[in-house]
Amino acid sequence: IEEENADVRLIGSGAILREAIKAREILKKYNITAEVWSATSFNLLRKNGMEVERKNHLSPDNDSELSYVEQCFSDNDIPVIAATDYMRSYSEQIRPYIKSPYHTLGTDGYGRSDSRETLRDFFEVDSTNISRSAIYALYKKNHFSKEQIIDFYKDLEVDANKPNPWEVWCQK
């Protein structure tokens, strides 16, 4: 879903694409415009990036080709949030090809949930946490004051004391 003058870009992969679309609606409440992108395969995007990189290295006289990801995200100032129902390392594969601030959300750890909704909240890949990550990325770029982000987080019911999902399995 393209958005002219987007403040942030959201990448959703698999079932989490729906959460990214919901996050876009949540962000509207805070006057934040978001583009939503679907990543059907971070593996293929990485391979394309490596292929283009190799081609450029082998042809220094013609080394200006860009990978598909670089073409899509050529504006280096717009934060990108990638969310997937795989481990974060899955979406981290394209980090070298994104020059913008890049934040990844994934299901690292051991989940113990009775529903998909609870599982996505547990791993922080639901629409609320995608929104939180987008708001934080914009805060780091000085789009919001500390007071504003605190108010946004209260409204989103962000629990700063929630344990890291990737460490919960070993806690007693």
Predicted regions mapped to residue ranges:
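Thiamine diphosphate
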Residues: 1-172
